[in-house]
Amino acid sequence: MKTHFDTATAKQRRDEILDTFLRMMERASKEQVRAVLIAGDLYDKRNVTKRVRSAVLGCIAKYPDMQVYYLKGNHDHAGAEEAGDAKIPENLHFFGEDWSEYVLDDSGRRKVMLYGAELSKENSQKLHESLYVAQDDINIVMLHGQTTKYMQGGKAETVALDRLKNRGIDYLALGHVHAHAEEALDKRGVWVYPGCLEGRGFDECGVHGFMLLDVDTEKGKVEREFIPFASRTLHEFPVDVSGCSDANEVFDRVYSAWEKAAIPDSDLVKLILTGEVSEGCDPDPGLLTQQFGDKVYFLKVRDKTSEAIDTDRIAGEKSVRGAYVRMILADKKSSEEEKKALIRTGILALAGEWDRLEESWEKQREAD
């Protein structure tokens, strides 16, 4: 999840991520939200500063009429209940390894109930079957884990969907996956990963935000809407520069793709160069960083190109490398991609071009 920020930029991003949580709470208050559900990974790091913890707890206490329900995740090494010198707000509620239940609303025709439990190795195999809810209530269930169709032995953070179907769940609120995703659980309910409020690294690209639920206690319906809310968006931006013969042609190819993409200047971008370039072409990631770096908040350039090899020409040679290429091409067990990699490695090794060989391996490691 690292993005290799300099110190000042890293601090600014940490502040922005904290601010997004504070803004979300303010938005919830303005929307007259009665309950905020946090399904884990609130801090998502081992060491949480006193400043951050105080800001989070202080923000929750600022809205006493809005109840906050916090279920710890696998990345919450220091949970909100470990407040240090700070006082736990009365409107902040927690869960244990057995099912906890809270009444969110009992003023209408149907009660709105919240159930939640923290998954562990000790309870993961039996927790799903021990959930009992009233079928006439509107039931929200909160868990933190990876969804699977069926229970998998030995894995604590497993949400076995087959064991939660047809149990009266209207909305299954999940944490653990940091991207928004949702599907039908059964004919009655849905399961939803709202994702995290902000993407922190380039493994968390795309739109981030939160889910806003509108519960109709008369009709027994839960309407949901995903609200994009992140201050910045992260993008993986691949550009095929196949056939380019020098850095100028690479620039032109990237510039054309960049103009079409219309990426906001407030966002973070990982530019990935792909394809086969002409022999001797250096795409020059450092130069591209200088040329495009001022177009966005943060830019990282990764060169995953390879030099084109005229396999047919080399295979026709009466030489050691020609014999090597013919041998690889005749291999019926290897895929075309594997053959390309073997041919490239062999040709560079036979030519004694160890620097280029190491560079090729480095690109492959980055690609993997």
Spans of model-derived segments:
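N-terminal active-site segment of His-dependent metallophosphoesterases
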Residues: 1-55, 345-356, 360-368
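His/Asp/Glu-rich metal-coordinating catalytic cores
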Residues: 6, 35, 44-201, 205-214
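Conserved active-site and cofactor/substrate-binding residues in soluble primary-metabolism enzymes
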Residues: 16, 159, 208, 245, ...
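A generic secondary-structure signal
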Residues: 23-27, 31, 59, 253-260
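Glycine-rich phosphate-binding loop signature in dinucleotide/nucleotide-binding domains
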Residues: 28-32, 108-109, 134-136, 217, ...
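Alpha-helix termination/capping residues and helix-transition junctions
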Residues: 30, 62-65, 166, 263-265, ...
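Conserved residues at the C-terminal ends of beta-strands
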Residues: 39, 175, 274
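Accessory, non-catalytic peripheral segments of nucleic-acid enzymes
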Residues: 217, 221-368
